[in-house]
Amino acid sequence: MKTTIILILLTHWVYSQNPTSGNNTATLCLGHHAVANGTLVKTITDDQIEVTNATELVQSISIGKICNNSYRVLDGRNCTLIDAMLGDPHCDVFQYENWDLFIERSSASSNCYPYDIPDYASLRSIVASSGTLEFTAEGFTWTGVTQNGRSGACKRGSADSFFSRLNWLTKSGNSYPTLNVTMPNNNNFDKLYIWGIHHPSSNNEQTKLYIQESGRVTVSTKRSQQTIIPNIGSRPWVRGQSGRISIYWTIVKPGDILIINSNGNLVAPRGYFKLRTGKSSVMRSDAPIDTCVSECITPNGSIPNDKPFQNVNKVTYGKCPKYIRQNTLKLATGMRNVPEKQIRGIFGAIAGFIENGWEGMVDGWYGFRYQNSEGTGQAGDLKSTQAAIDQINGKLNRVIERTNEKFHQIEKEFSEVEGRIQDLEKYVEDTKIDLWSYNAELLVALENQHTIDLTDAEMNKLFEKTRRQLRENAEDMGGGCFKIYHKCDNACIGSIRNGTYDHYIYRDEALNNRFQIKGVELKSGYKDWILWISFAISCFLICVVLLGFIMWACQKGNIRCNICI
């Protein structure tokens, strides 16, 4: 019986020795911010990894209207840019206008003599980039012909008229002499001359207007020469006309000379447009124009340019995000998110960063949770938090700087005879978009990987900094926590946080407590052995006592045992 009592007391003494139950130790855990529901981003190593915060990088919608600030936006209304340049009567309001962006509407149409421009896209681009319809008339001398031809297909008011920037020349009497006119460029800028040739609908119309059965127009400079012969024949009727005019253009450099030679069918220039170099453009759009501010315009409307990428439209003007095919790309602006697990008592509540993050941290991304003689508490670490934020801040701006186009992406137009060129251009544009889409995804994945790595590194730096401060005064419990072997009140915890902790002050106390605790602290394996040994001895003693009682009772006659065979 004495042995049993001794073993029971020994077992009770072993389990009563809880090193953390007194006031001479403390527990300190390091952790990081977490949220209940994070955002999934893509990195180089993971297609989906959860972070506490992320920023969308792809602008996918427009504001639905075109802002007239920060650019001069000119609404073409029912006129195309070329009609306004030629002087179509219903476009007279646009003479001498200036613009950064000329908006052509889908409802725009010509309202004069039907024409075509063999190199329409190039002329439209040249005029659009010039940003002005500034026109200067010149004194061309056309001897022996009738000037200012008119047509019922081109009404100015109720009267027959013609394009105001062109001079339709026809016979005078019964003659149309050969014309040979020169015009030098003595200015220091390029001059754009617009001219044309008339294609009559029949031979009868040809001789009626020009006498000769076939005319010819040759326009030359020192650098180029164009000779055009009319194609006589009936065409589909447009505004009462089956004839056509083909419009051509010639640029005369400073010091060069314009020479026009013709014996019929000439639609002559009246002067020149002054070409300017700039970043003006033209865009087809039906979006309304309104008073607002935006640095990026698409046919769908203006879009903000605070994101590096957009998938609203390939055609843009201004300082615009790069067009890509992806609908979404998210840039990590927070750390890896490990939602906090269910609390498992007081020690589970202060589990360290290795196990999970901490929700509800409001004073930093990284911090401390502790338990000491004064209770429990939590505090953020501003220095490590600021170090991480400083490295993440500016990531978005750097991505925008790398990708935003500082120029406009104009529309591409080609005639039917240039179909192969159009196919090639489309292939090149599609390849560029595919390449940029891939580059964008790769760039964001790299940045996300860097963000997660650097935030993890800041957590590790804080842990190592704390370990170096505590030295032998504490023991790494694993999971991001330390057991401090001396009394550490809130002021002591504060000194660890701000880096002023002096381990020499607590060294003797910590060593003494460590030795005392270690002297009586039994490992879980030894405790198990003692339990099994005490259990076995107790069972043996109980059996001995029970057997002795039975034998004693048998001797006294109180118990009789019959054995039958």
Curated annotation (Swiss-Prot):
**GO annotation, cellular component aspect:** host cell plasma membrane; membrane; viral envelope; virion membrane
Which ranges does the record list as Extracellular topological domains?
Answer: 17-529
Kindly state which keywords UniProt assigns to this record, in alphabetical order: Clathrin- and caveolin-independent endocytosis of virus by host, Clathrin-mediated endocytosis of virus by host, Disulfide bond, Fusion of virus membrane with host endosomal membrane, Fusion of virus membrane with host membrane, Glycoprotein, Hemagglutinin, Host cell membrane, Host membrane, Host-virus interaction, Lipoprotein, Membrane, Palmitate, Signal, Transmembrane, Transmembrane helix, Viral attachment to host cell, Viral envelope protein, Viral penetration into host cytoplasm, Virion, Virus endocytosis by host, Virus entry into host cell
Compartment(s) of residence:
Virion membrane; Host apical cell membrane
Pfam families, sorted: Hemagglutinin (PF00509)
For this protein, the record's InterPro entries field holds: Capsid_hemagglutn, Hemagglutn_HA1_a/b_dom_sf, Hemagglutn_influenz_A, Hemagglutn_influenz_A/B
Q: Name one GO biological process term.
A: clathrin-dependent endocytosis of virus by host cell
Origin: domain of life: Viruses
Query: What does this protein's UniProt record list under function?
Result: Binds to sialic acid-containing receptors on the cell surface, bringing about the attachment of the virus particle to the cell. This attachment induces virion internalization of about two third of the virus particles through clathrin-dependent endocytosis and about one third through a clathrin- and caveolin-independent pathway. Plays a major role in the determination of host range restriction and virulence. Class I viral fusion protein. Binds to sialic acid-containing receptors on the cell surface, bringing about the attachment of the virus particle to the cell. This attachment induces virion internalization either through clathrin-dependent endocytosis or through clathrin- and caveolin-independent pathway. Plays a major role in the determination of host range restriction and virulence. Class I viral fusion protein. Responsible for penetration of the virus into the cell cytoplasm by mediating the fusion of the membrane of the endocytosed virus particle with the endosomal membrane.
Family, as annotated: Belongs to the influenza viruses hemagglutinin family.
| Self-association state and partner proteins as the record states | Homotrimer of disulfide-linked HA1-HA2.
What more the UniProt record tells us is: Major glycoprotein, comprises over 80% of the envelope proteins present in virus particle. The extent of infection into host organism is determined by HA. Influenza viruses bud from the apical surface of polarized epithelial cells (e.g. bronchial epithelial cells) into lumen of lungs and are therefore usually pneumotropic. The reason is that HA is cleaved by tryptase clara which is restricted to lungs. However, HAs of H5 and H7 pantropic avian viruses subtypes can be cleaved by furin and subtilisin-type enzymes, allowing the virus to grow in other organs than lungs.
Q: What protein am I looking at?
A: Hemagglutinin
Q: Which organism's genome codes for this protein?
A: Influenza A virus (strain A/Equine/Kentucky/2/1986 H3N8)
